């Protein structure tokens, strides 16, 4: 393998230690950071994500609250619970694990979270503020990717960056953060005519579509930085990303593995956002 591995586990460990230190300082002043996580239904993947988030809180000195509801929970009941958490001074961050059951409007649920507690960064107030470069919170996955660029000293100013994927959770905010950092950004997606023509010119490629082998070695410029946000399963049932790791790692300059790349960073930045919310609340108290 010629590419330098961007180790999300190692970087997460460093950033979580910093978050734990900040959490301890707040707790000493009577403002222990608190995160509420709401899980509706029994999606197995969601259960794993929620368990990992709660464990990260416990390991780093945060107060955490897990609300578990059956898939039959009504939308008004969920909105009422969010209202209670909005008013709870012990809770600084509220996260509703997606996806939600079909009868619940996820947009309405996200908009019900107070913007100052929207640690996922999905509320329209935070999404809009991201356009101005002044959000209260940056969405956790793109924020984590930016921390990777910073830690590995990947130059962004003037770089050609391609983001594959246009979701509100990763693709769009990722493109905005890269733009803010001075990169020239292209967003590609399922309707893009010649994906390879775009990626071959890119100094940075972020793959975030949830489709195996969407990026192969022949599509990558030698020495490029490749960030794999995808979470898929291969034919053997093993976790894999959107990038053909074996091939692309022979061409790229830097690459993230799956697992052990972007995944741990997402939860780490959730802790960082919760700390920032708690620090703001403490300053206003």
Curated annotation (Swiss-Prot):
Pathway: One-carbon metabolism; tetrahydrofolate interconversion
GO CC terms of this entry: cytosol
Residue stretches spanning the membrane: none
Keywords tagged on the record: Amino-acid biosynthesis, Histidine biosynthesis, Hydrolase, Methionine biosynthesis, Multifunctional enzyme, NADP, One-carbon metabolism, Oxidoreductase, Purine biosynthesis
GO molecular function, one term: methylenetetrahydrofolate dehydrogenase (NADP+) activity
Residues reported to bind NADP(+): 165-167, 190
Protein family: Belongs to the tetrahydrofolate dehydrogenase/cyclohydrolase family.
Protein name per its UniProtKB record: Bifunctional protein FolD
Gene encoding the protein: folD
């Amino acid at each position: 393998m010629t590419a330098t591995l961007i180790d999300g586990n190692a970087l997460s460990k460093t950033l979580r230690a910093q978050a734990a230190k900040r959490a301890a300082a707040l707790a000493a002043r009577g403002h222990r950071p608190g995160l509420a996580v709401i899980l509706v239904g029994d999606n197995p993947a969601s259960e794993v994500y929620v368990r990992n988030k709660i464990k990260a809180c416990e390991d780093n000195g945060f107060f955490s609250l897990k609300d578990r509801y059956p898939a039959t929970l009504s939308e008004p009941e969920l909105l009422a619970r969010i209202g209670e958490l909005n008013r709870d001074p012990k809770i600084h961050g509220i996260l509703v694990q997606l996806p939600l059951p079909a009868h619940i409007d996820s947009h309405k649920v996200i908009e019900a979270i107070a913007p100052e507690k929207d640690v996922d960064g999905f509320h329209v107030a935070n999404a809009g503020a991201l356009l101005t470069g002044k959000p209260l919170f940056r969405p956790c996955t793109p924020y984590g990717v930016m921390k990777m660029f910073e830690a590995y000293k990947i130059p962004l100013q003037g770089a050609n960056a391609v983001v594959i994927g246009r979701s509100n959770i990763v693709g769009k905010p990722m493109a905005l953060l890269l733009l803010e950092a001075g990169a020239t950004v292209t967003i590609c997606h399922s309707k893009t005519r010649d994906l390879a023509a775009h990626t071959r010119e890119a100094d940075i490629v972020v793959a975030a579509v949830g489709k195996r082998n969407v990026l192969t070695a022949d599509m990558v410029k030698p020495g490029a930085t490749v960030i794999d946000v995808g979470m898929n399963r291969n034919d053997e049932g093993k976790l894999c990303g959107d990038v053909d790791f074996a091939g692309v790692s022979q061409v790229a300059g830097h690459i993230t593995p799956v697992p052990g790349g972007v995944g741990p960073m997402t939860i780490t930045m959730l802790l960082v956002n919760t700390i920032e919310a708690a620090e703001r609340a403490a300053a206003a108290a």
